[in-house]
Amino acid sequence: MVNGDLRIQYYDEELNIRKVIEQADLEHLDQALNICDLSSLERKLRLWHKLMPRIEPHYAVKCNDDPVVVKFLADLGTGFDCASKNELKLVLGLGVSPERIIFAHPCRPASHLRYAKEQQVVNGTVDNEYEIYKLRKHYPDSNLIVRFKSEAKKALCPLGDKYGCDAEADAAALMLLAKALGLKVTGTSFHVGSGCSEVEAYDRAIEKAENIFKVGEMIGHKMELLDVGGGFPGIDDEMFEEIAQSVNTSVELRFPDKRIRIISEPGRFFVEAAYTLICKVHAKREVRSKDGKLDTMMYYLNDGIFGAFAGMFYYPEEVAPELYLDEAESLPKLKSVIWGPSCDAMDKISDLLLPNLNPGDLLGFRNMGAYTMPIASPFNGFDVPETRFFKAK
């Protein structure tokens, strides 16, 4: 049980970041520190069940694959979206049954398919004829979930250029091919894009899914699973409520038969808000104009875009660090740049206004739980952040 995990520290009412920092002995810690509030995951799951009780969440492991996080969600009863052999190993190794897993990658290496077969992970996505032939050879008893393209007009990371067949031009042909080869198509899936901010995107996709279900049944497949993918926001609960209402309405209209199982692949929804990253200023320098006037303050932190900020390569955003200084808000602000620790000039986190800081001062960055640590690297020999876990008693 998670409650027996010695890596988790417990707090009474509310996690006090300042108190954690005071007790963390950061003066002697070279790398940055992640503070993960696991109770945030519990709150998110309660919100999910409240707003979308029919939709089974299958956590997207790629979003944050820390074993403590994955184990915590497993103990709460979520399913899992895995995309590789190693992700399957992680989840299965924690005691999760194969029935709670969808192998949600349309283009998998043959060795990964053979491993899924050995472990009886039967549900997996497909979006092209080559993958169907591969499945006939390596895992003919699997359940094929046809993934189609249906993108949001607003998303942080669109996925349609890489994955998803055309719902009208390709889906029927793929299901016919599967039938001819003696394979089972049991459902369909889509992904509107990571970090979706267009409510209507899900209804458009679910309408396409309804048509694919009808065609699949006509071909002779037993269609029984709809996967509505991911894209659910991690820090905008108001947006999530709007999306949930849209999904519920569309599902009830187009899939009223409760025997049809409906799952999803939320990632950032669960973990984005759970993490706060604490960085330390380890060096500073002043940039002055030719006449000697101070122009810019440069601060060098112990983490950067090769670490937990790596996602900024893909979707740059403004950062708003919290300062753990007395009366920080009242201090005069200076034009500043915060850099990561590496030698690479691309390792720049942000231009912003900050009070005068000194080596040893700390900056906190909230909402750092999604697509951060899995893509962080120790480039230039700088360690990736350490993570410490907390939970309400």
Curated annotation (Swiss-Prot):
Regulation: Inhibited by antizyme (AZ) in response to polyamine levels. AZ inhibits the assembly of the functional homodimer by binding to ODC monomers and targeting them for ubiquitin-independent proteolytic destruction by the 26S proteasome.
Superkingdom to which the source organism belongs: Eukaryota
Gene3D superfamilies attached to this UniProt entry: Alanine racemase, Lyase, Ornithine Decarboxylase, Chain A, domain 1
Pfam families the UniProt entry points to: Orn_Arg_deC_N (PF02784), Orn_DAP_Arg_deC (PF00278)
Pathway: Amine and polyamine biosynthesis; putrescine biosynthesis via L-ornithine pathway; putrescine from L-ornithine: step 1/1
Residues annotated as site: Stacks against the aromatic ring of pyridoxal phosphate and stabilizes reaction intermediates: H191
Active site: C343 (proton donor)
Binding sites annotated in the UniProt record for substrate: Y314, Y315, D344
Class of this enzyme: lyase
GO biological process, one term: putrescine biosynthetic process from arginine, via ornithine
Name of the molecule in the record: Ornithine decarboxylase 2
Lineage: Eukaryota, Metazoa, Ecdysozoa, Arthropoda, Hexapoda
